[in-house]
Design a protein with these regions (language model features):
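Forkhead-associated
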Residues: 28, 41-82
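Intrinsically disordered, low-complexity acidic Ser/Thr-rich regulatory segments
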Residues: 1-35, 45-47, 75, 82, ...
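Beta-rich catalytic cores
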Residues: 38
Length: 95
């Protein structure tokens, strides 16, 4: 799951590919009320029992536990990883 730190909204990460951004027509989790989030900002993928996040060449970057995620390069997520999309923070929890 992803927990949005701003308002504690919780969203289940489902499927093998999960898109995050502000364009509700293109993503699985639409982030509203934040203009710094790209239309399609990042993608979480599941491979076996592991989860990875990939920055979708966003304008304002993706970070995991304070480390920038290079665009297009999958970055392994751990349970309770802190994800930051631009200035929006989330906590990732493995199911």
């Amino acid at each position: 799951t992803l927990q949005r730190c701003r308002d504690n909204e919780i969203k289940a990460v489902e499927g093998n590919e999960f898109l995050i951004g502000k364009d509700a027509a293109k993503v699985d989790y639409a982030i509203f009320n934040n203009e710094t989030i790209s239309r399609v900002h990042a993608k979480i993928t599941k491979q076996g029992n592991e989860y990875y996040i990939t920055d979708a060449n966003s304008m304002n970057h993706t970070y995991v536990d304070g480390v920038i995620v290079p665009p297009g390069a999958p970055f392994k997520l751990s349970n309770m990883s802190k994800i930051r999309l631009s200035d929006e923070e989330f906590i990732f929890q493995k199911p």
